[in-house]
Structures are given as structure tokens and as C-alpha cells.
């Protein structure tokens, strides 16, 4: 697969796109999932009602493009590419000592393979490896094909990173090692992001595949479809690994305290899901409004475009109050 004159991962067999690093990874994930099924352990998953729609939505983004206000859409697609590049950080996750921090054996599980290949394969998929491009470069190519090589604002990364210093994280389960809790938080966050991304893929394929607003609809939509296929094993292995840990007993740093894996995983999952499904959409709304006013120099027209843009908002809100406990949907492995 070559995009923007960059050799990317993956390729074609008889004209069909084949994702990279799947010959061993995909059957291994199926086997680990089957072991959960045989043991009658469920898979944790995110209920669809908790998944916020992409912002801006298709109608909003198409409206901007038809109005000639391309920059906000360019920014949105560029941010996706940048965030994909950040995915390389998953290789830096420090995996705890499962032999001393989990009561039951993890032999023959996805957990046992996180540090020996799964995290590294995930990182290479997202950010590329050596001279091969990954999803970062593929998103950039889809953007450039669909929007006809738009001018990229030079402040996208700066504005993305200027949200202020992150608050000091309060330990959720201080009984556990810092490494165990940090790994769980990272894996949960990435799984939530990857699950939310399914709506982003559908949005991008529809928008960039729309001949009314896309310069190269077939090529742009195809690249996004390739990325979507590549992401499937990410969701699958993270789901399986977290479900494996959920079915086990975690041992505290004192070597004596034990915690139910289900209690810990469900607690982390509920907390992170609520935060990401409420904060991220609001941030996207605020950023989109600011982007419109940056892109349109005429203040009166900018206000008019922004109002019409808001009228096309789907109005989605998170379905639970802050004091309500979230459902954690479990399904058969």
C-alpha cells in the first residue's frame, strides 16, 4: 500500500487489502478468546449507547466544506492522524510481574504476550515502523486525497497540546502496584478510544467518500477502510486481555491483599468510560467553534456559519447522570 508516495504497511492479495502482522496475531487472539469461552468467562465490552458520535458529524463537516470553510475539517483529520501517531507510546507501557501480582497462572493468555509482541505490533500499526508508514501516514493521505492537499495549519499540534498541565492522578487502587494500575488505565483508555473510533471511521468514509465534497472519493474512503480493518485486532486483543484479568484475582503490593479482578476492571472501565464519553465531545465542540472563527475572517459570516453548524449538531448527550452507575456490558466469549 503506497499513500502520498510513502510505502505503508499492509498490502494486497488478489486485489483485496490485507492488514499487517496478522498471520500469527489474529489466530492467537481467536485461541485466547476460545479459552475464555471454554472457561465460561465473559468478554467486557462498551454498550453502544455510551459511544458518542464523531464531532463534527457528517452533516456538519459537509456543510463546512460546501461553504468553502475547509480548515476546521482539515484540522479535525489532522488531529486524528496526530493521535494515531501517539499510539506508538503503547510500546512504553511497563507490564507488571504477573507471577507475583496475579494469583492464577497467565500461561497461554493474551496477558502473557503483551510485552513480547502485542504492544509492539500495536505501536507499529499506529505510527509506522522504520521506512513503513502506519495509520498516522494513512490518515494524512486520506485527508490529502479527499480535501485536495489542503494547507495544514502549523498550530494544530500546539493547540492540541495546550490544554493545560494534566492533573496529578489519584490512585484508584493503591493496594495494587503502580505498574499494574498504570497498565490497566492505559489499556482501558486505548480500548475505549479504539471502540469510539468505529464511528470516526464511518464518518470519514462517508465524508471523504462523498463525491460532492471529496476530490478523490474512492481513494480517500478506501484508505480509511484499510485503517478500520487494521484496528480490529487492537480492539480484540485488548478486550481479551482485560477480560482475562477480570477473571482472575489480583495481589496487592504487600503480597497478602487480594482484589477481585472483576471489581478492579469494572471500576476502572466505568470511570474512564464516563470521563472520555463526556469530556471529549465537549472539547471537540469547543474546538470546532474556535476553528470556524479562525478560518473565517469576516466576523459576521463566521457567526452565521457557526450558528448553522450548531443547528446540525445531533444533540447527543451521555445517557447517565454523574451519580448513576454505568452498565458494564458483558457478552459471551
Which residue stretches match the model-derived regions?
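Non-heme di-metal
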Residues: 1-333
